[in-house]
């Protein structure tokens, strides 16, 4: 019993030290190739803390974000969400810039379609519980608040008129839902307003 306690304590200490190191160094999510992503069942290794210089200036035009729009590239944009157990969960994400507005988009496909929103992805659940997120774009960190776009017509507009519920036909001629798209509007937080000096968005 004494040996078991020593081993257990050693394992706990190693885990604590490892987490402290990762808190300082960061652990970004994996950036697999498109082929590897599909082979892994449309999944990629999640990360923990994202590291980078935090941007404190308000962004008035997000169109430049398009250059980081390839989620499979090493410079793809990343999202850090807050878990209930206190250790961040980060993933690569697809961003949709619309001038002064910025959106996140994500889809449920294959096995995830069998789960009700937001249970299809861990980060969806995290954002629904706590909308305070951090985006890493071009090596810099943006503290944001993510708000789900619940209006299906608005999501269709963001998708260029395409329905967020995508239907396909199987080999037997039967129609089925093959994709379900979700969008979040993201707002900067902890940013001084231009004139009032107040802080924009929710604070930590």
Which ranges hold each PLM region?
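Short N-terminal helix-initiation segments at or just after the protein's N-terminus
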Residues: 22, 26, 69-83, 127, ...
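Short, conserved active-site entrance elements at the starts or edges of catalytic domains
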Residues: 27-88
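Short beta-strand segments
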Residues: 74-116, 143-144
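Generic detector of short, locally flexible boundary/turn motifs and exposed helical patches
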Residues: 43-44, 56-72, 99-103, 108-113, ...
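N-terminal Sec-pathway targeting helices
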Residues: 1-17
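Short, structured beta-strand-loop surface elements
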Residues: 39-54, 110-204
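Membrane-interface motif at the C-terminal end of an N-terminal transmembrane signal
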Residues: 14-34
């Amino acid at each position: 019993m004494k040996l078991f306690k020593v081993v257990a304590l050693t394992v706990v200490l190693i885990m604590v030290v490892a987490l402290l190191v990762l808190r300082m160094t960061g652990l970004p999510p994996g950036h697999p190739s498109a082929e590897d992503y599909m082979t892994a069942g449309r999944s990629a290794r999640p990360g923990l803390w994202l590291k980078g210089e935090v941007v404190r200036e308000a962004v008035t035009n997000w169109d430049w974000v398009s250059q980081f729009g390839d989620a499979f590239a090493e410079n793809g944009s990343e999202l850090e969400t807050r878990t209930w157990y206190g250790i961040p969960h980060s993933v690569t994400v697809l961003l949709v810039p619309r001038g002064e507005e910025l959106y996140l988009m994500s889809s449920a496909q294959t096995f995830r379609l069998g789960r009700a929103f937001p249970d299809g992805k861990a980060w969806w659940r995290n954002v629904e519980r706590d909308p305070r997120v951090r985006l890493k774009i071009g090596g810099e960190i943006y503290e944001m608040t993510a708000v789900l776009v619940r209006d299906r017509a608005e999501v269709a507009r963001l998708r260029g008129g395409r329905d967020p519920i995508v239907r396909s036909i199987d080999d037997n001629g039967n129609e089925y839902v093959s994709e379900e798209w979700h969008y979040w509007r993201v707002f900067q937080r902890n940013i001084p307003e231009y004139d009032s000096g107040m802080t924009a968005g929710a604070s930590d």
